[in-house]
Design a protein with these regions (language model features):
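Short, solvent-exposed beta-strand-terminating loops
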Residues: 1-4, 100-106
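Membrane-proximal, lumen/periplasm-facing interface regions of secretory-pathway glyco-
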Residues: 1-34, 50-53
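Extracytoplasmic
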Residues: 36-41, 46-88, 96, 104-129
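Active-site charged/polar residues at nucleotide-handling catalytic sites that mediate phosphoryl
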Residues: 91
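Short secondary-structure junctions
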Residues: 128-139
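Short hydrophobic/aromatic beta-strand or adjacent loop that forms the aromatic wall/cage
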Residues: 140-145
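Short beta-strand-to-coil "C-cap" segments at the C-terminal boundary of structured domains/repeats
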Residues: 146-152
Length: 152
């Protein structure tokens, strides 16, 4: 069973295309193909819960899970979801990629966005409001592509 599900030998034997294999084994692949086909080449992506930027083929920030994500610091500094969105925009990002499945896995192991102290609940609330302040362009396999509005 492992060989049937994960093996790429079918690609080498030309029984399956590389794209079909990637689509079947990588949850972010179809979102990445959407980005490549629909977003301008100058798009700048902020990846959240996604540490595999290769297929997106756009300038991006995708921190390793064992490093603090810049979004953590920006959230601590923000007074509102609008402040956070404005900061992301000022940093030059045009789009956000959110992989919720991978985010949960990484957060469980690396505690990506664990806020502490008296402001923790407020900071968590600001971060959770972020998706609702952007425009969703694509969603599949729990991977979302958002556009950051020019103004809010």
């Amino acid at each position: 069973l492992h060989d049937q599900v994960f093996s790429s030998k079918h690609v080498a034997l030309e029984r399956e295309s590389a794209g079909e294999f990637a689509r079947r084994t990588l949850d972010q692949y179809e979102a990445a193909m959407y980005v490549r086909s629909n977003l301008p080449s100058e798009a700048h992506l902020l990846l959240i819960g996604e540490s595999r930027p290769f297929y997106f083929d756009r300038a991006s920030l995708s921190p390793y899970p064992f490093h603090e994500h810049p979004l953590t610091g920006w959230t601590r500094e923000a007074n509102s979801p609008k402040d956070l969105l404005d900061k992301i925009r000022r940093e030059g990002f045009t789009h956000v990629i959110l992989n919720t499945t991978e985010f949960r896995r990484l957060n469980a192991g690396y505690h990506l966005f664990n806020f502490t102290g008296p402001e923790a609940m407020r900071q968590d609330h600001i971060l959770k409001q972020l998706p609702g302040n952007m425009t969703m362009l694509f969603s599949k396999n729990h991977v979302y592509v958002f556009e950051i509005p020019l103004s809010h």
